[in-house]
Amino acid sequence: YERELKYLIKKNEKYTSKQFLEFLYENGYKLVESFEKEKHETYYDDNDFSILKRGDVMRGSNMVTEQFKGFLYKTNKCNPQKPYVSKLELGTKLRGQYKDVNEFIKELNIDVKGQLNIKLFANMKREVSIVEKDGDRLYVSYDKVKYFEKDESNSVYEEMLEIEDWKNPNTTNVDYDYDRHLIKVNNLISNAQLPIELTKDSKYFRGYTVLNNR
């Protein structure tokens, strides 16, 4: 289970990971650690786009930095009253075991129409900072993403921020009621009028929509 705030850097605005961290420091956060990652993601769907329509995500990740490949299915659990995105991750225990996406989806018993095939690629460079304040931790990712359907030379580029509640890192144990921290952070950001805008779109939805509306 994953709960995170997502923001797009507004078009024609320059807003860096460093600037956002400065903003957090001014508001009492301390840096715990920071590192960089690179990953190439592939998004799959059937020809009816059933997964896209549900707001779910079926992705294959090639973690360049960690040299790891695997599939993951994310079910949309968003509450329209809340500013953050909630997703239930399926297949985490099977990651790395399957070479074929259709075998993976069959194992999870997900409702799709026929075979899945590739609908979108996203190559990203991610700057990660883990920050802390009053015992609450945030996993802040600043992503530079290129979306494309076949060839990277015909891609769309975007920058975005993801802020994940990191109270229990790398676990599926979530205190469902404890979302005060993320709500507080979102209020902080809204009041500061930073050049970023809240979004609930997955990267799959975002990339597919942006590429097809050019």
Where in the sequence are the language-model features?
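Phosphate-end processing signature that detects enzymes handling 5′-triphosphorylated RNA
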Residues: 1-214
